[in-house]
A protein has these predicted regions:
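Flexible loop residues that form catalytic
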Residues: 9, 31, 63
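Aromatic- and glycine-enriched glycan-recognition loops and surfaces
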Residues: 35-53, 79-103, 167-168
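Glycine-rich, aromatic-flanked loop segments that form ligand/cofactor-binding clefts
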Residues: 56-60, 92-148, 184-189
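Positively charged n-region of N-terminal signal peptides that target proteins for export
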Residues: 1-4
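Catalytic domains of carbohydrate-active enzymes, especially glycoside hydrolases
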Residues: 42-68, 179-180
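Active-site-adjacent "subsite" loops/lids of carbohydrate-active enzymes
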Residues: 23-37, 114-179
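Hydrophobic h-region of N-terminal signal peptides that target proteins for export
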Residues: 10-19
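Aromatic-lined carbohydrate-binding/catalytic grooves of carbohydrate-active enzymes
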Residues: 55-88
């Protein structure tokens, strides 16, 4: 019941934000822009450009399909490096939130749920820490296989039927809600 209440609250917050007029939303992908968004002045520059273009809402991707997050977490691995680039140590999320709010923009956390591994680079919880939690898929002529054994599958998913997986994902969401002043959360996948 408690879990349902939290999810209902998050959905309500998101709906209220979008119902207040014509929104223009920009999704800021954390992997594609990892290096670009690795400096406070660069973040402020891009938020300024979004505001100048009439964007009213930002969705900041903070948990991508590797399952790594862009903040220090008690639950998930933190993405500090991507494509041989090491991000300098600074408060990435609050830099975005402050810049967006300074322009009166709404900012949501974008979070991939149950997507916790990227097969192309072999990164994510399904490859190491939570290998036993990976989803099992039916593959014609091969039967049931763990997602990490399926060729050509770029995104690896955790098994949402497992209670420990549900708790893990909810703990990450709660952690974000407790620690950051986002205006809402967009759940992806």
């Amino acid at each position: 019941m408690k879990r349902l209440s939290i999810i209902s609250l998050l959905l309500w917050i998101g709906m209220v934000a979008f119902a207040t007029g014509k929104s223009k939303v920009m999704w800021l992908d954390c992997s594609a822009n990892f290096q670009r968004f690795s400096y406070p002045d660069s973040i402020r520059y891009y938020v300024d450009k979004c505001h100048e273009a009439g964007i009213t809402h930002l969705v900041l991707d903070i948990k991508d399909n590797t399952g790594e997050v862009l903040y220090p977490s008690k639950y998930a691995a933190q993405k500090k490096n991507w494509k041989n680039f090491d991000r300098p140590d600074f408060d990435f999320i609050n830099t975005f939130i402050k810049a967006a709010h300074a322009h009166g923009m709404v900012i949501f956390a974008g979070m991939n749920i149950f997507a916790d591994g990227q097969n192309i680079v072999k990164r994510g919880a399904v490859f190491d820490k939570h290998k036993k939690w990976q989803a099992i898929n039916y593959v014609p002529r091969k039967g049931l296989l763990p997602v990490t054994e399926i060729e050509g599958k770029p995104t690896m998913f955790l098994n949402p039927a497992l209670k420990e997986v549900q708790k893990y994902e909810i703990d990450i969401i709660k952690e974000v809600v407790r620690n950051y002043a986002f205006d809402g959360i967009m759940l992806d996948r």
